[in-house]
Amino acid sequence: MTRRSVSRKRRANPGSGPGEQSDWDHSAHKRKRLPPEKKSLVFYLKSRELKPHNDSTYLHLLRGHAACTLPSILSEREFHLGNLNKVFASQWLNHRQVVCGTKCNTLFVVDVQTGQITRIPILKDREPINGSHQSCGIHAIEINPSRTLLATGGDNPNSIAVYRLPTLDPVCVGDGGHNDWIFSIAWISDTMAVSGSRDGSMGLWEMTDEVVNKSDFQHGLSRVPVYSHISHKALKDIPKESSNPVNCKVRALAFNSNNKELGAVSLDGFFHLWKAEQTLSKLLSTKLPYCRENVCLAYGLEWSLYAVGSQAHVSFLDPRQPPHCAKSVYCREQGSGIRSVSFYEHIVTVGTGQGALLFYDIRAQRFLEDSTGNCRNAKKKGDTLKLSTGKGWLNHNEMWLNYFSDIDCCPNAVYTHCYDSSGTKLFVAGGPLPTGLHGNYAGLWS
């Protein structure tokens, strides 16, 4: 008896509706299924600790599974930051230290094991700042690829300050470039960084060997911190696409290291793409599908996608595709805005102005659900997984007394969040969303 051959062709997926990104190709990102016993989070942590496996594919599978599983079991530990006002930026320095920048222009390091806060001296311009200058604080902290230099804002929020890692000794200040606040910074190589300013320009700064070695020599001769002053290598204005040029402010930057391309978001609702190597050359500008309150941007290298936050949506842009192919997801946080966004494996983490953390699965194209029903905000099992920040600290100032004293709890906007290198710890920080309120929040979710 002959055995009949059976066709196992898969049925084609139905076409997507208008505005849906039907051409997302997930075949390149299909992963082998793990055996049931190896899907355990405990197994992942044990294997990471013992490191018996050298197979990068296997470790990639484990990291992907952990990224999807961890959010539902994270628990919060708050840190007390005193009377600091609104944490705008943060980066992990190592497995136990996170560096942060605030609206009150304070740069500090928090030890996530002890909760100890250490303040870092702010670097000043070569010329004193005008006394009438109002500081907006530190909005950006970025570390170069080799993790040897850290770039952030200076005492003058229009200037870029660079520190050496891991010591946080000062290296240089880039001043005289922008005439308004720096909102974002991106490293495009180990020695070159780009700053995006509220004046609508992007500055290219180079930390040459001469500058770095000079600061080394000066530190050896003096007990007082000394540093160099550098000028921009290039200064480019973003295109004034809108009818209101006042809104042409560079709000966020993200770098694609594979293609050497720099994405920029401006407050007039446009996404700009630049070739970023030894200089900046414009490639394209496109209107965003949702163009209100575009204040955060991230790039997912594995997915070749930019994620842009707006008032109530996260939009995913692939510069290789026509603008109408952009996919946007509604975050159910209308009115408060998306304040921070990041990629980790196939999960996009979203921080909102209402103090919520949401987790979007790019492969499944949906938000993670609460599989346990134990989440603080979940009404029932299967609801969208939402983690809510703690109370933090709030100054009961005149603004609060006049306008917010009848509110039981003022939520803390998630202005910044970042995963550690293992992907098992999530640092989250921010403060009250209303401009006149003074307060802070910082917590470790692990």
From Swiss-Prot:
Top-level taxon: Eukaryota
Gene3D superfamilies: YVTN repeat-like/Quinoprotein amine dehydrogenase
GO molecular function per UniProt: ubiquitin-like ligase-substrate adaptor activity
Annotated Pfam families: Beta-prop_DCAF12 (PF23760)
Biased composition, class Basic residues, residue ranges: 1-12
Cellular component GO terms held in the UniProt record: centrosome; Cul4-RING E3 ubiquitin ligase complex; cytoplasm; nucleus
Function: Substrate-recognition component of a DCX (DDB1-CUL4-X-box) E3 ubiquitin-protein ligase complex of the DesCEND (destruction via C-end degrons) pathway, which recognizes a C-degron located at the extreme C terminus of target proteins, leading to their ubiquitination and degradation. The C-degron recognized by the DesCEND pathway is usually a motif of less than ten residues and can be present in full-length proteins, truncated proteins or proteolytically cleaved forms.
Name of the protein described by the UniProt record: DDB1- and CUL4-associated factor 12-A
Organism name: Xenopus laevis (African clawed frog)
